[in-house]
Amino acid sequence: MYICLLTLVLIHAAAAFVAQNATGILAGKDHCVCEVLLPDSSFPAKRVGALEDETIRLSNRVEDEMQKLEEQDIILDTYSEKIINLTRRVEYLEKLHPESLVEISFEVLKREIRELEMYISAMRVKPNGNSVQVETLYNEVKNMSKTVGQLETLDKNNVLQAKREIVNLKKRLVDCEKNLKAKPSLMVPLGSCQHQGLAHISKPNLMQLNWKGNAYKSGAWGKDAAWNTTKKSLYWVAPLNTDGRVLESIRIYPSMSDLQMYKNPIDLPLSMLIKNKLNNTFAGQGAGVVVHNNNLYYNCFNSHDMCRASLTSGVYQKKPLLNALFNNRFSYAGTMFQDMDFSSDEKGLWVIFTTEKSAGKIVVGKVNVATFTVDNIWITTQNKSDASNAFMICGVLYVTRSLGPKMEEVFYMFDTKTGKEGHLSIMMEKMAEKVHSLSYNSNDRKLYMFSEGYLLHYDIALKP
C-alpha cells in the first residue's frame, strides 16, 4: 500500500489547482497508480454565469433602493422642518382647548372621506332633491380629500379641523338625504330671500390662528361676500394691531388650502411709509371690515370716512359717512373702535353705525357701491353698546349679545324692507368670550367670526 499525491487541474475560469492524498499501488519501479472517481466530468459553467448575472442585477437594485432612501431622507428632512415651524400653532390650540387635541388616524380619516365620496356620488344620480346642494357637498368633500392629503405630514391642528369638517359634512349629508326624500325640497336656494328668516346657527368650526399670531386678538376674516361674486374661493384675514384699533394691512389667500397652509399669501398695505414716516391716511380703524366684489370696505383711521381699497389694483378711495360717530364713541360691547361695521348680503352692501341724532341707537345704511355713498338709512330702537355684534341677511339686521364666555344669542332683528323689528332667541356657541367681528356670506351661507385671534365659521339655516 502506497500513498500517492494527486494533482487535479479543473479547467474553468473560477477553478484552481486541487491537491489530495490517496491510497494506490506501485506499478513498476517509478509509477504509482491510484483510482479516482469523479461524479461529473463537466463543470456547471452556465449556472455560474447565470448566478453572476443575478448578482449584478441584485446589486443594481440595491443601488436603486439606496438612492430612493437618500431621496426619502431629503423629503423627511423637509417635512421635519415644516413640522417644527408649525409647532407654535399646535401649542396655541393646546392652551385654548387641550381636551380637543387627540391622536387622529389618517387611514380612518381618508376612509371616511372615501365613504362620503361614494355616498354623495350615489346621491348625485337621484332625480329628485336639490342638485345645487348635492353638488356643493360633493365639491366640499373633494376639497377636503385634497386638504387631508396635504395635511397628513403636517400639524395636528389642521388634522383636527379636517376631522371637524368631515363630521359637519356627515351631518349635512343626513339633512341632504332628507331633502332628497321630500317633494318638493324645503331647501332655500342660495341667493334667495324667499324665506322666513334665520332659524338656526351651527356649532363653531375652528379654522386656525390668524397669521400674525396669538398677540393679535382683534380683527376680521372671511371670503368675498358679494352675492355670486367671481372670487368665491378667495379668503382674506385682517388682524388689527395689538392696540385693537389700527388696521395696517390685510392678507389674501387664493384658496382655503392656501389659507390653512399659510401658503401663497398676498399682502395689501393700508398704511404707507412716506419719507420714513408711517402715513395712516388709508389705514383702517376697528374690525368692521368686509370684502365685497373684490374691494375691501372699512372705517378710515381717526375719521367718520368710509374707505374702499381694490384688492387687485390697489386703488384707495374715501368718502365721508355724514353724521356718523367714530373714535370709539359707540362701539359694540366688549370690543373697541367698531363704530362703523360693514356687512354684505344677498341685497348688497350695508354699513352699521350710530349718529348723534340716533343717540347711540343702531343705524343701518344701504351703500351704493357705484357712487360710494349711503343712499338710505334706517334708525332702530336697539342700543349699539348693548350688542356684541351684528350682521345682515336679505336686508334684515340681526343683532347679537353675550350670555357668558361660551354662549352668544341673536336677540334682535330689524327688517329694512318693512321697517318692522322684533325679538328672537337663537343660541350661538363660541370658543372664547369676545366676539371681535361677525359677518355673513350669502355664497356659502356661513357666518365668519374673529375671536381672540382665532378664525371660526358657522353654518346657518333659514326658515323656508
UniProtKB/Swiss-Prot annotation:
Keywords: Disulfide bond, Glycoprotein, Olfaction, Secreted, Sensory transduction, Signal
Compartment(s) of residence: Secreted, Extracellular space
GO BP of this protein: sensory perception of smell; signal transduction
InterPro entries assigned: Olfac-like_dom (IPR003112), Olfactomedin-like_domain (IPR050605)
Coiled coil region boundaries: none
Positions annotated as glycosylated: 21, 85, 143, 228, 279, 383
Pfam families in UniProt: OLF
Domain Olfactomedin-like, chain residue ranges per copy: 192-464
Tissues showing expression: Expressed exclusively in olfactory neuroepithelium.
Record's keyword annotation contains RNA-binding: no
Gene Ontology CC entries for this record: extracellular space
Disulfide bonds: 193-394
Function statement: May influence the maintenance, growth, or differentiation of chemosensory cilia on the apical dendrites of olfactory neurons. Major component of the extracellular matrix of the olfactory neuroepithelium.
Xref: PANTHER family: OLFACTOMEDIN, OLFACTOMEDIN-RELATED
Known partners and oligomeric status: Oligomer; disulfide-linked.
Name listed for the protein in its UniProt record: Olfactomedin
Phylogenetic placement of the source organism: Eukaryota, Metazoa, Chordata, Craniata, Vertebrata
